[in-house]
Amino acid sequence: MIKTVVSTYGEFIGEVDEGADVVVIKKPKMVIQSEKGFGFAKGVCVTSVSEPEEVTIQKANVVMVVDTNPEVLKAYEE
C-alpha cells in the first residue's frame, strides 16, 4: 500500500513494508516544497541514484507513517 513516511531525513511517498526495526519504502519519492507548491526530488538524497528501487529507514528515525493525500497519490502515480 502506498503511504507517506515522515522521517528525521524528510518526507517520502512509496509502497511501505514495515519490519521489526526498519521501514522499507519501495519506489520511493522524496517530497520537496517550493513557493509554487510541492514536487518530487529526482533521488532520495543529494548523492543517491535517480529513482532508487527502495530505501530502508531505521524505525528510530521514523516520525510517522500516514495515508497519502489522494491528490498527492495521483501525482506520485503519474
Question: What is each residue range found by the language model?
Answer:
Residues 1-78:
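Conserved RNA-binding domains used in RNP assembly and mRNA/RNA metabolism
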